Amino acid sequence: MTATFLMSMIFGLACGQAMSFCIPTEYMMHVERKECAYCLTINTTVCAGYCMTRDVNGKLFLPKYALSQDVCTYRDFMYKTAEIPGCPRHVTPYFSYPVAISCKCGKCNTDYSDCIHEAIKTNYCTKPQKSYMVGFSI
C-alpha cells in the first residue's frame, strides 16, 4: 500500500467515527382501536441512528442539564393522517402520525418525541389487517 492510500484510509476511519449517523429510517407501525374491526399497517419514517456522546467526569459537580446526552431526533417532520378501516360511526377513524423529513443529534424534545425507551414490544396487531398499506409510494 502506498502512504497516500494508507493515510486516506486512516483519515476516513477517523472522520467516520467522529461524524454522527442519524438519518430518517423506514419504519412500519401497526395501529388499531378497540372499537374498530381492523388493524392498519402504516409505513413511515422515523429518526434512528447513532449520535456521538461521552460520559462526563465529575458528575457530582455539574448541574443536571449538563448531564443529558444527545439522541437521534427530528429536525424537520410533518404529520400525515390515515383512516383506520372498520370503525363504527360514533368512533373517529383517523390516526395522525409523524413522518421524519430530516434528523439531527440533539436533546430529546418531549413536545413531539417520546423520550422514554419502552421495554415492552407494542408494535403488533391483535385484529385482522387490511390488505393495503399506507405510506411509501413505490
Swiss-Prot record:
Record flagged with keyword DNA-binding: no
Alphabetized UniProt keyword annotations: Disulfide bond, Glycoprotein, Hormone, Secreted, Signal
Gene Ontology CC annotation, any one: extracellular space
Signal peptide start and end residues: 1-20
Keyword hit for Glycoprotein: yes
Propeptide: 133-138
Role of this protein: Indispensable for the control of thyroid structure and metabolism.
Family: Belongs to the glycoprotein hormones subunit beta family.
Protein name (Swiss-Prot/TrEMBL): Thyrotropin subunit beta
Organism of provenance: Bos taurus (Bovine)
Name of the coding gene: TSHB
